[in-house]
Amino acid sequence: SNCMKKSNLFFIIIFSCITVVAQSKDELAVRAVLETQRQAWNAGNIDQFMDGYWQSDSLMFIGAKRVTYGWTNTLNNYKNSYSDTAAMGKLDFDIQEAKKLSEMYFFVVGKWRLTLSKGNDSGFFSLLFKKIKNKWVIVVDHTP
């Protein structure tokens, strides 16, 4: 019947809207992790910056020369590479792609920029976020 068709269409529209709202809520949560990281970095706080990463030995960081496994190893690499706030500079992100892959995974591609006293640096990154204990964290970071 015509009434049934309208009713079905109504539910399709409602469920579509719910999906979009849920996706944007997750995307906002993922972007908030990156913004918190940016602020921590710019405050010279690598420990707080690392809160955005999965605290696990299975965390994967893919750099230009090697793959590093583990949260602690990644933290130590950051601390060795950026010994002080002058070396850290000021970080900025330009998110180019943010895609929800499933209820548990989110994929982000962006450009990072470091403003340093000795000259600026920039590059691209891709991040795989996973929702663990109701919190989005980076489980794979590819920053060559």
Regions found by a protein language model. Name each.
Residues 55, 101-102, 132:
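Structural motif
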